[in-house]
Amino acid sequence: MKMLTSAAAAFTGLAAAAATPPVAVEWKAPETMPAKVARPFYGYLPNGDFLVAGGSAFVDGRKTWTDGVYVRRDGRWSSAGSLAALARLDGVSDGLCCETPQGVFCAGGTDGGKDLSSAFLLSLSGASGSPGPVLSAQPLPVLPEPVKMGAAACDGKRVYVVASKNVYALALAEPGEGWSKVAELPGAPREQHVAAIQNGDQKERLLVVYGGYEVASKMPLYDGVAICLSDVGAGETRAVAPLPPLVTTIGAAFLPSGHQHVLLVGGFGWHGWIDRACKGMSETDPVRLGWQRKVWAYNAVTDAWCAYGELAAGDSPRCGAAAGLRPGKTPESYEILLAGGETAPMRRTDAVSVASFRKVAKFASSAWIVVGLYALLMAAMAVYFIRKKKDENDYFRGGNRIPWYVAGMSIFATMLSSITFIAIPTQAYLADWRYFVMAFFIVGMAPVAIYYYLPFFCRLGITSAYEYLERRFNLGVRLFGSAAFVVFMVCRVAVVTLLPAIALNAVTGVSIDACILVCGVLTMVYCSLGGLEAVIWSDFVQGIVLMGGAVAVLVILILKTGPDGAHVSTFWNVATAQGKTTMFDFRFLLSQPVFWVVAVQGLVSNLSSYTSDQCVIQRYIATPDENATKRSLWFNGGMSVLAQVVFYSIGTALYTHYRTNPAAMDVTMPKADSVLPLFMAVELPPWLAGLVIAAVFAATISTLSANLSSASTALVTDFLKRFRPSMSGRAQIRSGQACTYLVGVLGICAALALSRMESSALFDNFNKYIAMLTAGLTGLFFMGIFLPRVKGGAAILGLVANYAVCFGCEAAGCDVFGVRFHPFLLGGLGLVACIVVSLLASFVVREKGRDLSGLTLRTLAKGANSGRAKASGPAAST
């Protein structure tokens, strides 16, 4: 193994090296604010203004509590009134505050005589005619207990207050309901702790609380506590990684950054606090070893700390400063701000430090060359197939001459796509291997498709899978099924286009919108001109590139984990110790992704893909005969399971790499789905980064082209050709090209809309909606083959029941009659509802009998005609 890893390192040009942060903190020219205060209320307002209110100051050596309110807008500070006028507070400091979508939440603190329990929301009033910002204060319910030097955080809907021992929550939309107790911190009461809300391991939403000091002993605390805020497990607490050695949170700020990081800025050093608070030193004495200059970063997913820069040279470290982090679309548009605070005991400052992030690693020109060469290869293939003389049979059915291994690789590339390349590693990085159970059904469904479904598609001479539905049921069922498939394709095009756009944006900085447009338009042109044969052969090439790039990434990730000679052992030990290899969870729970829940999703989604998805069925009918199709299905099954192993391993390796090298991750990473693309951009050799990005786009193009080709075939065959039987072959091709552009444009628009939505895990949402949208189609084909008594009217009633159950339960938040279940069960519930309602309706709805010869399992001539029947769709026309 050691020789193997050494050879791999030599091949890739990699050696074990210290991780370099992909972005650096870059400080700008200092500013000054109108007052010298420490421990005020502070935060960014929704419009980007920074607010400072109240705080303590020293006047002639005497500590005072102030009520001034100041706002920074576009680098300039101005007065915005007083807390006395806004909130009837003559002076307050040591309060707790956080940013909310409505304004800055402020609560508690002290006025020098007593601890306070008041709470209010400071926001811009919208008044006009004033030269400066105009603020208003919205009163909120008083805290359950007086709190000073506590912490607060907001998840967008609720404000959480962490007092000395208890954690409380208030719903911003319904403040009249008051505060509710969420959890209790372990250990003795504490003060000067910090808190932030961030995305954690196992895709949980966490309230992370760190440090402070014991109220009684004044001894600093280094522990961390994570409180689960997710619907499942809400209020549960667990210990997380302690603070770095000799680092405290006393007087520090805790600022969420990106998708999963929190930055710790400012505060006392350990020796400074011990000298001042625990050894009885006078406040007039200087702090012996100074305060914290470093900026520390905590990753809530990998549960690891690292140093991530420090204050600018010549800038004094400070405690109790007003601090904020305003996110941006790029690292350079982020803003970190430290205003005021104390630089020594009894010494306040009006200094303001402002910083942003600077991207250190960039996509090299050599990487672009590799991507360009790959694009030229695809263009050459497109030109070749465009120049080939083709009729409608070539365009829609590939001329029935595609070799079985090419068709198998095409099915493999179509079913995996960029969703596999980006979303599955993200899933394994954020959670574990529980979703891998779905991969077993890729192979498990292959014999079902081969022995029970494939004969119908191969022997009926159909071009669209939904032609079978008209023969078996009626025209209405065919049209409904085809329309549902096209809608699903639009949704799939959106997700498949968005994922590589996220990748390219993370790697190059090109906007996500531009990436979506380029990828979508190029694929539309390629697919519309080349037809099915071009799509399948490009799938073959892209599938090879996809797997080659994936294996290279996995090898390099493991090489970058742990010391020389211990890469594999470190990878395995860290993964198992942190529970990242968990696959089988046999608890009987409906609300968690346990084995039974994931198995239902795997069964429904793969049964749908093999039996009712035109993308896959189109490849069945592109081979010369039924036996070739069978071989292609077995080939796809083996390749798919191998690919799942590789991509889940990549996700696990990403976790072990960033847990052992926390400084290597970008603290500004906006989405979890960017984790693999960012690794490619920062840590792969340029030529390999180009190859892997090409692989991502290979996956995208293969799936998009398959989606567009199959959707256009369905539209032409089931709608245009069905109602205009006399359409010429040339007219069918032109119509197919137009439909390709139509579906492509709709998918691109959906991708642009989806990119503006908050989504922590696209893979979960994709799996949920694929089951919801296709469960009814799966039920139709199942009933058509296995339940001969179900006819058209009953089948339509079953479809209505399927969508009512799926979308009704989803609208109810997967909580029906007090029973909460995981979204992965929606497809299974819909499928069962479709079959049961149709079967029951068949006893009530009277319908005229149809000739079912060759259309059900009972009437199919076993072993007869394993070749191809003449096409009845577009390809049949001359």
Q: What kind of region is each of these model predictions?
A:
Residues 357-878:
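Membrane-embedded helix-loop-helix hairpins and adjacent transmembrane boundary segments
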